[in-house]
Amino acid sequence: MLWQALRRFGQKLVRRRLLELGMGETRLARCLSTLDLVALGVGSTLGAGVYVLAGEVAKEKAGPSIVICFLVAALSSVLAGLCYAEFGARVPGSGSAYLYSYVTVGELWAFTTGWNLILSYVIGTASVARAWSSAFDNLIGNHISQTLKGTILLNMPHVLAEYPDFFALALVLLLTGLLVLGANESGLVTKVFTGMNLLVLGFVIISGFIKGELRNWKLTKEDYCLTMSESNGTCSLDSMGSGGFMPFGLEGILRGAATCFYAFVGFDCIATTGEEAQNPQRSIPMGIVISLSICFLAYFGVSSALTLMMPYYKLQPESPLPEAFTYVGWEPARYLVAIGSLCALSTSLLGSMFPMPRVIYAMAEDGLLFRVLARVHNGTHTPIVATVVSGVIAAFMAFLFELTDLVDLMSIGTLLAYSLVSICVLILRYQPDQEMKNGEEEVELQEERTLEAEKLTVQALFCQVDSIPTLLSGRIVYVCSSLLAVLLTVLCLVLTWWTTPLHSGDPVWVTVVVLILGLILGISGVIWRQPQNRTPLHFKVPVVPLLPLVSIFVNVYLMMQMTADTWARFGVWMLIGFAIYFGYGIQHSVEEVKNHQTLPKTRPQTIDLDLTTSCVHSI
C-alpha cells in the first residue's frame, strides 16, 4: 500500500505534457512578426550591458581583450540560443523553458524552471528600472537622488536601498499599463526604442574607430605609472595587469567571459511569444539567431571602440561611453550617448517585463499556479491579471531594493533554464512521435505493451536496430541524458573546488577527471548511436548530441561560480515555490484533472481554449 502510494506520488512529479495538435491554438492574439521578435530580443539583450558592463569588464578583468570575452560569451549564448530555437519550432507555445521542460522532463522540473524564470524576470525588471532612474538622474545633474536623500532615507544597509526610488516605481507601473494594452502596442514601442539604440551604437562604433588610437591596445606599465604620477597616485602592477592586449592574461579573459555571458541574457524572451507570434515555428528560431548575431556585432564593435578611444585603466565603470567621448574632446556626443542609454534601458526593461506575465500565465493555465492568473482580457487578448500582479511586485522591488546583491541569484535561474532546455532538446530529438488521441490510459497501456515486446540488449545500446525512434530507444536516451547531467555536474564541481590540485598534477584528482570524462564519452556514444526523430522542422540544432552537452557544461560551470550566500537565497526562493506547488499545483494541475476525468474514447483529448479570441489585431 505504501509502495503504491509512493509510486503514484512519484508519477505525479514526472508526468509530462504531451505534444498535441491543439497546442497551436491559443486565446492570445497572434500579432507579432519576425521583425517584432528580433526587436524584442535585441531590445531586451542589448541593454545595460553595452553601456555599463563593457567598461567594468575592460577596466577590472580583461583590458582590450574584452573583445575576446564577448566572442567567447557569444559562442556560449549561441549554444543555448540554438536549443531555444529548435524548441521554439517544435513546441510553439507560451511559457519558454517552462513549457519545454514540461513536455520533456516532467512536471516538477517544469515548475522549478518556471518559478526560477519568474524570479529572473522580476529581479531583472526591478534592477533595470533602478538603472534607468539613475541614468536619467545623472543626465539632469543628480537632482532627484539629492532631494530624496535629504528627505527620505532607508537606514537598512545591505537589505534595502539607500532611498526609495519613486521614479523607478512609476516607470514600472507605466510600462505595466502599456503591456496591459496589448502585445502589439508594446511591440511598436520596442521597435522604436531599439532602432534609436542601434543608431546611437552605430555612431559610437564609427566615432570610436575615427578617434581611437591603436596604441591603447599596446599599453605598457610605464604608461600606467606615468598616468598615476600625474594624478599623484601609486603605480601598482596588480591594478592594471601586465599591459598589452591581454593585461590580465588568459585567466582574465575567462573571468571576463563569464561576466560578459550575462550581457547576452534576454533573448529567451522571444521563446515566450509562441502563442502571439504569427508563425512561431519560423519566427522564433529566426528571431533568436538574428537577435544574438546583432547583439554580438554591437558588443564587439562598442568594446573595440571604447578601448581604442582611451586607456582601459582610465575607464569609468558607471558611465564608460559618455566619459570616453569627453576624454577625446567630443563633449556634445556625451549627451547623445546618454539618450541612447535611456533608449537601451527602456527596451531592456520592456524586454524583462514582457515574458514575465506570460510565464505566469502558462503555469496558471496548466494549474500549477492559481487559475485567476490565467485570466485573459477580452479586448486586448493579454494575460491581464498576470501582467498586473507581476508588474506590481517588480515595481515594489524597484521602489525599495538596490538589488545589486541579487544579480547572481537572477543568473542562477537563467542558467538553470538554459541547462534544462539543452537537456530537453537532447531528449526530445530521440523520442518517437506520439499523439494522445484516445485518452492517456490507452496511451500508457500501449507503451507498456510495446516496451514488453522490445528487449534491452547490447546491440540496442550501440547499434541502430531501427531507422526511426522507438519507445525503447527513447527510454535509453532519457536515462543516458539524466546520467550525463549528473556526471557533468560532478565534473564542474571538481573543476571548481579542486582547481589547485588539478593544476599541480595531483594523480588522484587527475584520475577522477579522466574517469568522469571517459564515462561522459561512453554514454554520449550510446546516445549518438540511437535513431533520431525525423519530424521536419524549420530549424534543428546541428551536431547533436555534442552541442547540447557543451551548452549544459558551460551553464553548470558558471552556476558553480556563485557564492554560498547566493545559493542560500536561492534555497529560500525554492522553498516558497515548493510550498505553492505541493500545497496547490500538484492537486490542481491540468494533467491531474485529466487523470480524474472519464472521457469518451472516441473523443480527441485537447486543450480547451476559446478559439474565437485568437485573432490578429494591429494598429
Swiss-Prot record:
One of its GO terms (biological process) is regulation of TOR signaling. One of its GO terms (cellular component) is plasma membrane. Inhibited by high potassium ions-induced membrane depolarization. Highly expressed in brain. Pfam families: AA_permease_2, AA_permease_C. The modification Phosphothreonine is found at residue 606. The chain crosses the membrane at residues 37-57, 62-82, 108-128, 163-183, 192-212, 245-265, 286-306, 336-356, 383-403, 407-427, 476-496, 508-528, 541-561, 570-590. It is a multi-pass membrane protein. Residues 58-61, 129-162, 213-244, 307-335, 404-406, 497-507, 562-569 are extracellular. Keywords: Amino-acid transport, Cell membrane, Glycoprotein, Membrane, Phosphoprotein, Transmembrane, Transmembrane helix, Transport. Residues 1-36, 83-107, 184-191, 266-285, 357-382, 428-475, 529-540, 591-619 are cytoplasmic. It comes from the Eukaryota. The modification Phosphoserine is found at residue 618. It is found in: Cell membrane. It catalyses: L-arginine(in) = L-arginine(out); L-lysine(in) = L-lysine(out); L-ornithine(in) = L-ornithine(out). One of its GO terms (molecular function) is amino acid transmembrane transporter activity. Belongs to the amino acid-polyamine-organocation (APC) superfamily. Cationic amino acid transporter (CAT) (TC 2.A.3.3) family. PANTHER family: CATIONIC AMINO ACID TRANSPORTER 3 (PTHR43243:SF104), INNER MEMBRANE TRANSPORTER YGJI-RELATED (PTHR43243). Uniporter that mediates the uptake of cationic L-amino acids such as L-arginine, L-lysine and L-ornithine. The transport is sodium ions- and pH-independent, moderately trans-stimulated and is mediated by passive diffusion. This is Cationic amino acid transporter 3. It comes from Rattus norvegicus (Rat). The gene is Slc7a3.
